[in-house]
Swiss-Prot record:
Gene3D superfamilies: 1.10.10.350, HUPs (3.40.50.620). A motif ('KMSKS' region) lies at residues 248-252. A motif ('HIGH' region) lies at residues 21-31. The keyword Glycoprotein does not apply. Belongs to the class-I aminoacyl-tRNA synthetase family. Glutamate--tRNA ligase type 1 subfamily. Catalyzes the attachment of glutamate to tRNA(Glu) in a two-step reaction: glutamate is first activated by ATP to form Glu-AMP and then transferred to the acceptor end of tRNA(Glu). One of its GO terms (molecular function) is zinc ion binding. This is Glutamate--tRNA ligase. GO terms for cellular component: cytosol. The keyword Protein biosynthesis applies. Keywords: Aminoacyl-tRNA synthetase, ATP-binding, Cytoplasm, Ligase, Metal-binding, Nucleotide-binding, Protein biosynthesis, Zinc. GO terms for biological process: glutamyl-tRNA aminoacylation. Zn(2+) binds at residues 110, 112, 137, 139.
Length: 480
């Protein structure tokens, strides 16, 4: 049989990996980690990375899911050299190989009815035998190819399938455990396990990195590859990701979609760094640049054990990257969250200033956008607990005094503002907090913000003075 590559197979490329998701839902973190490991291994070996969309499940595959997968890959910045390729667009190729296999006696048509197969399975179960097809149609020449049928792969009946998994070591499965796999359905569509084999062959895939739930598919796929004379790639089956309760990660553990993490305020660098460490390590190092990941990544350092997802660790990493990445870069991601929360940032400080002010305080960009609304728009009410705590005693007097001094400033800068607050406290013979905290609630609506001088510079003179007066009026109204 002849290879039919959908792209030029460069003979100088010694490693070519692929990520092959099924578009039946979003890109989840398990799939993202698999894609990352596959991508890193290709980059580590100066190889190529292929994106393939395995959409043979016509009932469950959707264009929306495909778009979500591609969006997730792009957000994570995992570019591919070839693709995306769609299995539904390669049905002619799969059927061509199946027809050749039938001609060469490597596969055969099966006309058995559902009733016959159900009866066979029932008999085998009664006899405590492993359910498997009995090859009733292997030498049946009494039917026409035009009659409804499936096509089965003629699996070897003797010996074993042995392969050296790059993560798990030697795996051996007896051929007696394997059935004659259906490779083409009655409707003429090829099945998943067969399409994968032809694609890996045609696309020159040298290393298949995928989840451990595919281990049972591997011997079947290897036997088909051997039958058609195709090279056998190296397989690496990575373990599952569990929640912190030890159960398989699912929706009940919170966000499992890659783009949900984007929506929740995580930077792609943080998620990538977290995912690479979720089953792989390089000494005790926790923080990895992308270049370091590429330089250090090896499949034989991937753990065989399941990993537990820890949101607190991810938040720690996210805050690290918020602090350490260039403010201009973080601000671009932050801008998305302002828009998502309906906050108009056209009238206020530069977003890079927001990042600089709040990097030490916020674990996520969503939190950063939410907690900095007051820089860009008016708030409707004061936080009830903060107002009750700080709008009492001589708060109105302190606010009036500090407003007077702020109004008189010739320059609206950090030093001048700090001096005005300090002088107010000195003249009233109170601690800085007796002025600073009522002022904070007055201008932000809450009891939390960066230092007052930084906050006031960011909000701007006119807004600050108007908000102080509003707070004074509020206090008087409460005391009336």
């Amino acid at each position: 049989m002849k290879l039919d590559a959908p792209f030029n197979l460069d003979p100088n490329v010694k490693v070519r990996t692929r990520f092959a998701p099924s578009p039946t839902g979003y890109l989840h973190v398990g799939g993202a980690r698999t894609a990352l490991y596959s991508w890193l291994y290709a980059k580590h070996n100066n190889g190529e990375f292929v994106l393939r969309i395995e959409d043979t499940d016509l009932e469950r595959s959707t264009p929306e899911a495909t778009a979500a997968i591609i969006e997730g890959m792009e957000w994570l910045n995992l570019p591919w050299e070839h693709g995306p390729y769609y299995q539904t667009k390669r049905f002619d190729r799969y059927n061509q190989v199946i027809d050749e296999m039938i001609e060469q006696g490597l596969a055969y048509r099966c006309y058995c009815t559902k009733e016959h197969l159900d009866e066979l399975r029932h008999t085998q179960e009664q006899n405590k035998e492993k359910p498997r097809y009995d090859r009733h149609c292997l030498h049946d020449h009494n039917h026409s190819p035009d009659e409804p049928h499936v096509v089965r792969f003629k699996n070897p009946t003797e010996g074993s399938v042995v392969f050296d998994d790059a993560v798990r070591g030697r795996i051996e499965i007896s051929n007696s455990e394997l059935d004659d796999l259906i490779i083409r359905r009655t409707d003429g569509s090829p099945t998943y396990n067969f399409c994968v084999v032809v694609d890996d062959w045609d696309m020159g895939i040298t290393h298949v990195v995928r989840g451990e739930d595919h281990i049972n598919n591997t011997p079947r796929q290897i036997n088909i590859l051997k039958a058609i004379g195709a090279p056998i790639p190296t397989y690496a089956h990575v373990s599952m990701i569990n929640g912190d309760d030890g159960q398989k990660l699912s929706k009940r553990h919170g966000a499992v979609s890659v783009m949900q993490y984007r929506d929740d305020g995580y930077l792609p660098e943080a998620l990538i760094n977290y995912l690479v460490r979720l089953g792989w390590g390089h000494g005790d190092q926790e923080i990895f640049s992308r270049e370091e990941m590429i330089n250090y990544f090896e499949l034989d350092h991937v753990s065989k054990s399941a990993s537990a997802f820890n949101t607190e660790k991810l938040q720690w990493l996210n805050q690290h990257y918020i602090r350490e990445l260039p403010p201009e870069y973080v601000a671009k991601h932050l801008e998305w969250h302002y828009k998502d929360q309906g906050i108009d940032t056209s009238n206020g400080p530069a977003l890079t200033e927001i990042v600089t002010m709040l990097a030490e305080r916020c674990k996520t960009l969503k939190e950063m956008a939410r907690s900095s609304r007051y820089f860009f728009e008016e708030f409707e009410t004061f936080d009830e607990a903060a107002a009750k705590k700080h709008f009492k005693g001589n708060a109105a007097e302190a606010l009036a005094k500090v407003k007077e001094k702020l109004t008189a400033l010739s320059s609206w800068d950090l030093h001048s503002i700090h001096e005005a607050i300090e002088q107010t406290a000195a003249e009233l013979e109170v601690g800085m907090g007796k002025v600073g905290m009522p002022l904070r609630v007055a201008v932000t609506g809450s009891g939390q913000s960066p230092s007052m001088d930084v906050t006031l510079v960011g909000i701007g003179r006119d807004r600050v003075l108007a908000r102080i007066q509003r707070a004074i009026d509020f206090i008087h109204a409460q005391n009336a």
